[in-house]
């Protein structure tokens, strides 16, 4: 950010908010993607491997993630992120305070789109710098391939997510659970866990067998990670999640949790979900009604079982993976961290 600030502000001091707001979005978060990238690298690297390539790759993932969150909040009309105003709200607040012409909201959304685009570019520049420092040229090429695939898949997954919020009415009920699971795989599981692991390992020159083990470990763990996030999106404490409780209900997320509630709940539960889910003006009492109906359907217990099954599969793969023992231990600890986050 320090190196890019001089480029941006040399164009005009009016661009200072782009840097300030970028810093704000990069200063928080749990750094899960960076951690998985680092431990993927550590799981296969030689003891004397230079650290700078993986630091650059992990940082590129964090900046990419920040950009994705900026765009995601625009898509979902989310007012907050990590307990603070989302990027488009920061910009529309700037517009309002400055007394400029036009609509605050329109300015905020347009500016945040550009901020996200800017950070996407910075992420790619940072990855390029990291790959140039890698000692294994073939591994660097593989890391770039994995990063490119991740960008395509997560964008596709994001489209599938917004599609499901609208297209579910035309789909057979029997297909909704599978469609919700597909969103999990591409919007989150591969992007949040599998890809960072493989990018880090590829950078260190991992063998095909090692990359295969990390994929087999990362996919079920990523699914469990997102299933936990879906539960938090409905029942989570705002102080823990940084988002208002029930935010996914207002946004109309057609998650595995919701699909299971519709499949196993009463007719009244299904009607309640279909009538209220996706209403941005849900009252607190309506959110409580939805939460109670979802809980009564048994969907939460079923999701908890899915989380446990996926974690068990990830641990099974990790136990016999051809990876360094210290990294295996840390990846095991991370497995607990990303799937046992509290309400």
Report residues per predicted region.
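Divalent-cation-assisted or electrostatically stabilized phosphate/pyrophosphate-binding catalytic cores
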Residues: 82-116, 169-189, 212-216, 238-264, ...
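All-alpha helical catalytic cores of prenyl diphosphate-utilizing isoprenoid enzymes
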Residues: 5-12, 26-34, 113-122, 129-235
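Short hairpin/turn module used for nucleic-acid contact or packing/dimerization
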Residues: 288-343
């Amino acid at each position: 950010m320090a190196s890019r600030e001089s480029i941006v502000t040399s164009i005009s001091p009016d661009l200072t908010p782009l840097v300030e707001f970028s810093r704000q979005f990069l200063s928080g978060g749990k750094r899960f993607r960076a951690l998985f990238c680092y431990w993927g690298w550590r799981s296969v690297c030689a003891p004397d491997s230079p650290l700078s390539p993986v630091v650059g790759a992990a940082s590129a993932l964090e900046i990419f993630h920040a950009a994705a969150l900026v765009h995601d909040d625009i898509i979902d009309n989310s007012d907050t992120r990590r307990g603070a105003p989302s990027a488009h709200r920061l910009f529309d607040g700037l517009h309002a305070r400055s007394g400029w012409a036009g609509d605050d909201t329109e300015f905020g959304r347009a500016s945040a789109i550009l901020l996200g685009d800017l950070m996407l570019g910075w992420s790619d520049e940072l990855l390029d710098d990291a790959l140039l420092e890698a000692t294994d040229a073939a591994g660097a090429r593989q890391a770039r391939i994995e990063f490119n695939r991740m960008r395509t898949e997560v964008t596709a997954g994001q489209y599938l997510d917004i599609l499901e919020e609208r297209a579910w009415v035309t789909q057979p009920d029997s297909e909704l659970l599978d469609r919700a699971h597909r969103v999990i795989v591409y919007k989150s599981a591969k992007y949040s866990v599998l890809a960072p692991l493989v990018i880090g390992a590829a950078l260190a020159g991992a063998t095909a067998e090692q990359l295969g083990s990390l994929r087999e470990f990362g996919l079920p763990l990523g699914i469990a990670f997102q299933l936990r996030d879906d539960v938090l999106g409905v029942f989570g404490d705002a102080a823990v999640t940084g988002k208002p409780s029930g935010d996914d209900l207002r946004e109309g997320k057609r998650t595995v949790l919701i699909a299971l509630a519709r499949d196993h709940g009463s007719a009244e539960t299904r009607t309640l979900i279909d009538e209220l889910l996706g209403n941005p003006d849900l009252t607190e009492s309506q959110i409580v009604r939805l939460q109670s109906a979802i809980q009564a359907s048994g969907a939460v217990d079923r999701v908890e079982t899915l989380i446990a099954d996926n974690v068990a599969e990830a641990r099974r793969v990790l136990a016999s993976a051809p990876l360094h023992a210290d990294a295996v231990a840390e990846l095991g600890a991370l497995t607990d961290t990303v799937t046992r986050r509290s309400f």
